[in-house]
């Protein structure tokens, strides 16, 4: 599963990375394909408690289904941070894709691996897969 900031404009980068990984023949757990799960056009969730619950439960279901979480460190995200913590707590591998410097220790601490570009990511995934 690829996760990153959806609410703060990162959904296109998530989709792009899913495409790259599919082209490299990785099995993808794509949490964005289901209808209604791309909420990038929603600017205020304060009066949408039911939708919030639905989105969070959906995303956590996909965290559970995943073997590896690839986290895009392109911008801060409440949801991504929670997904990282939960993934770590249930024994999933977390890879942080950090193309730019990271000015906080939190995502580094909750990552098993840190890569700086997609080529490093692909090499690491191949190593983790055993190939």
Predicted feature residues:
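Conserved catalytic or regulatory cores that recognize and/or transform ribose-phosphate-containing ligands
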Residues: 1-131
């Amino acid at each position: 599963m690829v996760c990153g900031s959806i609410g703060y404009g990162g959904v296109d980068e998530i989709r792009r990375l899913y495409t790259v990984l599919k082209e490299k023949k990785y099995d993808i757990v794509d949490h964005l394909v289901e209808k209604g799960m791309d909420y990038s056009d929603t600017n205020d969730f304060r009066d949408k408690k039911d939708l919030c619950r639905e989105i969070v439960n959906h995303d956590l279901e996909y965290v559970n289904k995943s073997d590896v979480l690839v986290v895009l460190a392109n911008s801060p995200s409440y949801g991504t941070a929670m997904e990282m913590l939960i993934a770590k707590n249930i024994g999933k591998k977390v890879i942080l894709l950090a193309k730019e410097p990271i000015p906080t220790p939190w995502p580094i601490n909750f990552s098993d691996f840190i890569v700086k570009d997609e080529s490093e990511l692909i090499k690491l995934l191949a190593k983790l897969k055993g190939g």
